[in-house]
Regions:
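Active-site-adjacent helix/loop patches that line small-molecule binding or acyl-intermediate pockets
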Residues: 1-82, 106-110, 114-115
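Solvent-exposed loop/turn segments at secondary-structure junctions
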Residues: 5-6, 52, 93-96, 116, ...
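Active-site Gly/Thr loop motif
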Residues: 26, 83-90, 133-183
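Solvent-exposed loop and edge beta-strand segments that line ligand/cofactor-binding
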Residues: 38-47, 96-103, 166-167, 191
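Active-site-proximal alpha-helical segments within enzyme catalytic domains
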Residues: 51-59, 100-121, 172-188
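Active-site-proximal binding-pocket segments
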Residues: 72-137
Length: 210
């Protein structure tokens, strides 16, 4: 999220939004990568779905393209983690839309959170290294607007429990609360104006298990 590329992540009706344009593009990573450089790379944090899809393109190209990327997701992550009904979606250029498009039931999203709560283990099987999990949920940046910390594709919740979370559109969320042995998922739809109320709600959920 510190690529330095110009980007507008707003989803508000009537705004000039790069993310809306990107999601309608046949080649999402190319659109994001073509944006002008606004800051020196590594110096400025700004949440960008475009950056996520650039990363997905780089990884997909390294693995050998669309089919290889899908096989890696299913064979090395989804199925070992217990995400047996998850479907990754790709754009017309063959890039996994990592920012936005994994179709999955709540159980599978829960399994993803549990994988990180358990340090990369799914039952007795190691799926991700402990080092990767630790790096993912360690603060690397701070979002100036919200004050939240950001790791590697994970947000840090800034609560008393040291929770970390995946934040989706309009309140979708996977929240992991390691000290309480708790992972929970929300798939509701709430407008951004109520984001402070949502954060209070998530904290109340955790408090109920404390």
């Amino acid at each position: 999220m510190r690529s330095g590329l110009e980007w507008n992540e707003d989803y508000v009706d009537g705004s000039v939004s790069d993310v809306i344009e990107m999601l309608a593009s046949p080649d999402m990573a190319a659109l994001a990568a073509a944006k002008p450089l606004e800051h020196e790379p590594g110096t400025h944090f700004y949440y960008s779905s475009g950056t996520t899809n650039i990363i997905a393109r780089i990884l997909g190209d390294h693995l050998g393209g669309r089919d290889a990327m899908e096989a890696a997701l299913q064979d090395q992550l989804f199925r070992p983690a217990g995400m047996t009904n998850s479907i990754p979606k790709f754009d017309q250029a063959g890039t996994f839309v990592g920012s936005s498009f994994v179709y999955a039931p709540v159980r599978d999203f829960l399994a993803f959170g549990e994988l990180f709560r358990n340090g990369g283990m799914a039952g007795e099987q190691r799926v991700l290294s402990q080092a990767w999990v630790d790096a993912s949920v360690r603060e690397h940046s701070i979002d100036d607007e919200s004050g939240q910390g950001y790791g590697l594709q994970w947000w840090l919740a800034r609560d008393e429990f040291g929770s970390f979370c995946c934040n989706g559109y309009e309140g979708q969320r996977i929240q992991v609360v390691p000290p309480l042995g708790l992972t929970f998922v929300r798939v509701g739809k709430t407008e951004a104006d109520y984001s402070d109320d949502l954060r209070a709600f998530y904290n109340q959920v955790a408090q109920a298990f404390a």
